[in-house]
Amino acid sequence: MKFSGLWCWLLLFLSVNVIASDVGELIDQDDEVITQKVFFDIEHGEEKVGRIVIGLYGKVCPKTAKNFYKLSTTTNSKKGFIGSTFHRVIPNFMVQGGDFTDGTGVGGKSIYGDTFPDENFTLKHDRKGRLSMANRGKDTNGSQFFITTTEEASWLDGKHVVFGQVVDGMDVVNYIQHVSRDANDKPLEAVKIAKCGEWTPELSS
């Protein structure tokens, strides 16, 4: 009887650990559930380059995702991304945009005011196409963002909030990272978000 009882406790222990492991996996997966998608139609000078589609992780970073969604879907160039440029590009690292007020990397503002705090650092810069907030230090998120073009950028973890992922059009991002640029990494010819908005399946047809 004692032997049977020991086996019962062992089986119970293993079952609890398996369940906990499964729950952990579900939580990790839930972090990267795409709640909304937006698109950028990119032009380089007079040339139409293509479309970038970005999925937003609104469950893990609802406030940050909402900020980006609103800035991507407004048709007012003074209040969002339409007509703005990628002002900084570094090959094999990232492309940066979102400064719709100044265009140089010193401007931009969030839908909540000039800036808002870091929401969390749950997601990591662990693959190409990560969408993350650019900032001037802790809790200074506005509208500027960057998209990674490297497989891994762990030195950014804990400093920049990851809240989305490129789901289509990474070839366009790769094009942007390799355009000719000046000594300050600004494209010599403007790389512009000519059109942007909410992406729906109908747009793929």
Curated annotation (Swiss-Prot):
What InterPro entries has UniProt attached to this entry? Cyclophilin-like_dom_sf, Cyclophilin-type_PPIase, Cyclophilin-type_PPIase_CS, Cyclophilin-type_PPIase_dom
EC top class, in one word? isomerase
A single Gene Ontology CC term: fungal-type vacuole
Location comes to: Secreted
> Span of the secretion signal?
1-20
Cystine connections: none
- Pfam families the record matches: Pro_isomerase
Arranged from A to Z, the UniProt key words for this protein are: Isomerase, Rotamase, Secreted, Signal
Instruction: Give the misc comment.
Output: Present with 339 molecules/cell in log phase SD medium.
Belongs to which family?
Belongs to the cyclophilin-type PPIase family. PPIase B subfamily.
Described by its record, this protein's role is as follows: PPIases accelerate the folding of proteins. It catalyzes the cis-trans isomerization of proline imidic peptide bonds in oligopeptides.
Q: What is the name of this protein?
A: Peptidyl-prolyl cis-trans isomerase B
Species in which this protein is naturally found:
Saccharomyces cerevisiae (strain ATCC 204508 / S288c)
Q: Which gene encodes it?
A: CPR2
